[in-house]
Amino acid sequence: MVILETPRVFLIASWGSEAVISAFTDALYRGVPWEEAVKAQAPDVIIKRISAFYRQGHWSVFEFMGAQFLVECSRACHTQFIRHRMASYWSESQRYVDYTKREIRFVVPKGFPADLLKRAYEDYARLREGFRPEYARMILPNATAVLFAVQMNARELLLNFAPLRCAYAAQAEIRHVCWQMFAHAWRLWPNLARLVWEDLPSLHRDFCTKVPRGEDCRLYAIKDAEEKHGPLPETPWLSALVHG
């Protein structure tokens, strides 16, 4: 039995890029042959075009970029996550996985009573003596870790998922997951991610709900998530705060 405080997010693969979106602009609107369009994307041109698409609300072009992640979080967090339907999922099944033969994991915030989790697993093990995993699983708590694959395009991740799940109003665990994904997005699509970072407090009307007046809603949400679930592996937005 393993008890984790920090949910985990692994970047598996990605598709598309800001350079590809910029190249599509030349190919579709200027008649430039694709091979030439791909080679002609200067960094300043890419920044200008990504910013223009974003500011003008032409967000559908960002669906041509996306990523695949492997996420490990609690069953409670997993249930919240898969409500975002503009994504593809493949999840660990408690119906078929036998946790008496495979290590069981739990994801809980700091200070959660470990003895309760130990007792739950012992009850599960006793049930497995007479029942299949699909019945024994009913005793497992929402803290039980679930490993799942998710595929999401950049528009869904940065302009729908992030404004909802990176906010302080979201539960700390899924918020921690969201900020980990945001950090990966920053490396993949730096110009779009920076634009979204700047506008996050205004992209959803409830983003700053419950945040004390005068606090930066983003940093307040991050600090609280880290206090409950440990430090984030990457924080690329700090450079944006320093350099403006």
UniProtKB/Swiss-Prot annotation:
Catalytic residues identified in the record: 165
Residue interval(s) of motif ThyX motif: 83-93
Molecular functions per Gene Ontology: flavin adenine dinucleotide binding; NADPH binding; thymidylate synthase (FAD) activity; thymidylate synthase activity
Q: Which residues form the ThyX domain?
A: 7-199
Q: Which reaction does it catalyse?
A: dUMP + (6R)-5,10-methylene-5,6,7,8-tetrahydrofolate + NADPH + H(+) = dTMP + (6S)-5,6,7,8-tetrahydrofolate + NADP(+)
The protein's required cofactor(s) are namely: FAD
Q: Tell me the route in metabolism or biology where this protein functions.
A: Pyrimidine metabolism; dTTP biosynthesis
Q: Which domain of life is it from?
A: Archaea
Q: List the keywords (alphabetical).
A: FAD, Flavoprotein, Methyltransferase, NADP, Nucleotide biosynthesis, Transferase
Q: Name one GO biological process term.
A: dTTP biosynthetic process
Q: Which cysteines are joined by disulfide bonds?
A: none
Q: Does the keyword Transferase apply?
A: yes
| InterPro entries for the chain | Thymidylate_synthase_ThyX, Thymidylate_synthase_ThyX_sf
Cofactor annotation comment: Binds 4 FAD per tetramer. Each FAD binding site is formed by three monomers.
Binding of FAD, residues: 60, 83-85, 153-155, 160
Q: Which EC number(s) does UniProt give? A: 2.1.1.148
Q: Where does dUMP bind?
A: 80-83, 93-95, 137, 165
Q: Say what the protein does.
A: Catalyzes the reductive methylation of 2'-deoxyuridine-5'-monophosphate (dUMP) to 2'-deoxythymidine-5'-monophosphate (dTMP) while utilizing 5,10-methylenetetrahydrofolate (mTHF) as the methyl donor, and NADPH and FADH(2) as the reductant.
UniProt record similarity statement: Belongs to the thymidylate synthase ThyX family.
Subunit structure, briefly?
Homotetramer.
What name is this protein filed under?
A: Flavin-dependent thymidylate synthase
Organism this protein belongs to: Pyrobaculum aerophilum (strain ATCC 51768 / DSM 7523 / JCM 9630 / CIP 104966 / NBRC 100827 / IM2)
The major lineage groups are:
Archaea, Thermoproteota, Thermoprotei, Thermoproteales, Thermoproteaceae
